Amino acid sequence: MPLRNSNTSSGNPLTRRAFGTAVGATAATAAVGLPAAAAAAAPTETTTHEQPFRAARGRHSRRPNILFILGDDLGWADLSSYGSPDIRTPNLDRLGRQGVRFTDAYAGSATCSPTRFSLYTGRYPGRTKGGLAEPIADRSVGLDPTHPTLASLLRGAGYATALIGKWHCGYLPDYSPTKSGWDEFFGNFGGALEYYSKLGLGGEYDLYEGDAEYKDLRYYTRILTERASEYVQRDHDKPWLLNLNFTTPHWPWIAEGDTAESAEIVRKIKEGGLGGLFHADGGSLAKYKEMVEDLDRSVGEVLKALKRSGQEEDTLVFFASDNGGERFSYQWPLSGNKSSLQEGGIRVPAVLRWPARIDPHQVSALPLFSPDWTATLLELGGARPDPAYPLDGISLAGYLLRGEQPKERNLFWRVRGERALRRGDWKYYRGNGGADQLFNLAHDQREQADRATAEPELLSELRAAWERTDAGLLPYPKAS
């Protein structure tokens, strides 16, 4: 496989081939509902002046550029605007102030690759074989290149498309962003890598430009930030989609400058086994804070580059996490964390800014999840879903632009050993213990007051709804 060399200049193109080939809840607080999540956290400068979301009806604009940014294993309350007591995230807080902050946004799953499947396809992870892996850990499965994606559908509607950062939807030679609708790719294929050496879970080198290895041993977050900043400043001749997928603050717990710790992890990786990269004996609250704040600065740099380009007004920027937080994450008041279908494993921070169409200083308590953004961005970009692959998400364009309140519906999740379904304020949950539980999230975000005995009919109804959806999905393969 050819090896490409790095160039530290951020002015270089993302690839060497030419790029470009090719909704308010009504105004009343009662309609939106007081954002219980926001109320649970102490007021901050960011949230004090927020108003319940109201669509700015009657505005018009061209199709937006789309900058879709993901953090990796970032917890729901790890941003200061979501209640973190010590982590400071001024750039992401500002992004939220400039648009709308969502208190009840969810990932499509509780781990990395299933959520990415749900975002890229707009469907439950269990619709596809690759989505059953939680997460993808080898070369046996991935996102089928024949399956339509957010990128392929937008590209068909005239968008330029690029993915920078973590892919985690399958490995070469069978799977790649360039096989699934993205014109350009720069990043890593696997679920994690050491931030300096770029060694992945199996000790393989995992930094690529397109489908060729790319040599750059600088700190990974810096490289991704440079690449994304260059991309958004290009003189594009068509609207564009950039999926910017940071690996921060996913383990290993390495901040920029931690070269000695990096070398020790590399030594362990080369000795064999997964322990080195998992970094179970490393990290700290202070190190996690450092990584999250670096993520915030990096997003800020990309947003400054976007502003310099003159495209800020017509660019929809969305930021979220791919799932709930990991071991050092701040989750209060939620229970659970990554891999669990408790709120702490699937509820994520999410903010959206689109100056041309969305007013600033707003907050929404509308329950939504990753596949909804697929449907929404397709509609805003003038693309239609493939009828052979019906979406499980709903478009929020009517809500965001015209104030159309979505009908009450079910949000569904499934991971091995757990199940969950949310309808309105009610959540049905069955954990590894096997007991069916029922929680009213409006009063009990922490999922401690089990209402299953008090509301047996509702429990039965939500359980049946979960089982109907589950029956239409692929079964998990039997454990070997």
Regions found by a protein language model. Name each.
Residues 2-5, 11-34, 41-436, 441-480:
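Formylglycine-dependent sulfatase
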